[in-house]
Amino acid sequence: MPLPWCFPFKQGKSKIAKTCSLPLDEETGLKLLYEGPTPKIDIIAVHGLNGHRENSWTAANGVNWLHDLLPGDMPNIRVLSWGYSLTTAANSHETLSQQKVSEQLVCDLWEMRSSTNTINRPIVFIAHSLGGPMVKSALLYADSAQGTPTVDLRSIRLSTRGAIFMGTPELDSRLIGLQSYLATAQGSEQESSDIYKEAHWLVTTLQSYPSISQQFWTLFVHERPDSLSASSALDQTASSSTQENSSHIFIQADHGGMIKFESSLDESYLKIKEHLVHVGKMLK
């Protein structure tokens, strides 16, 4: 029988309903993929734009490595995948604020961990593509949250021990054009457009994140399809290479395929697993 907290929470009953007020549907929110006998770590997966909390991590042969592979190598973990959408179910043309969506992640995590008495359990995030800025924005929000006797959202940031960012946008040469656009559009009518607001949120999040990133271990995973040159691949590490307590690896796959592994023998999966096991040992 499914546990009630595996599904989107009913806002009317939530202790933090006023903070977490985004519309939810059956495909968004947290979903439990695995829970070991004595979990020591919460692994939280966050997909990219227009992704799915299960399908995005599932290979063509039906293997979802978060559910089917990782528990075999790390049995004492709890794995949850978080789904989100930037449009509402009622109106596909209504765009939700990326900031508000990232705040929802914090609220969902706190609600689930509170209801299962696991508020202080260590967290490791695994984020793909836009999921990276979502997680970074969520952690910045949690870090600045003011706690109350019943709700302490800051515990989400304080419990975070690691993050794996897979194919996520960083402040490197690929975002120079976006930064130029913001500088040009500032003070004009474009400043009120959704495009400007989204770009401003992304750049601001990436610029602010280093202020908290040194508090935990980070692995940056970069895609390297056959068509990508070595120089282009190295450029992907430029912005984050100086971050303390971080490592970089490359995966021979395209953007969508880099988070799908068909078996426990997959070379890319072995790289990810090695780093997760390392974090697990550090937390013992």
Where in this protein do the model-derived segments appear?
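Short, surface-exposed "cap/lid" segments of acyl-processing enzymes
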Residues: 24-76
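Eukaryotic short linear interaction motifs
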Residues: 50-55, 87-91, 130-135, 163, ...
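Conserved alpha/beta-hydrolase
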Residues: 72-88
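Active-site loop/turn elements of alpha/beta-hydrolase fold enzymes
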Residues: 82-86, 168, 223
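Serine-dependent carboxylesterase/thioesterase catalytic core
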Residues: 47, 89, 99-212
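PEST-like, low-complexity acidic/proline-rich intrinsically disordered segments
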Residues: 1-13
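Short coil/turn segments at secondary-structure boundaries
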Residues: 55-61, 92-96, 137-141, 175-181, ...
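C-terminal catalytic-base region of ester-bond hydrolases, centering on the histidine
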Residues: 43, 50-51, 78, 90, ...
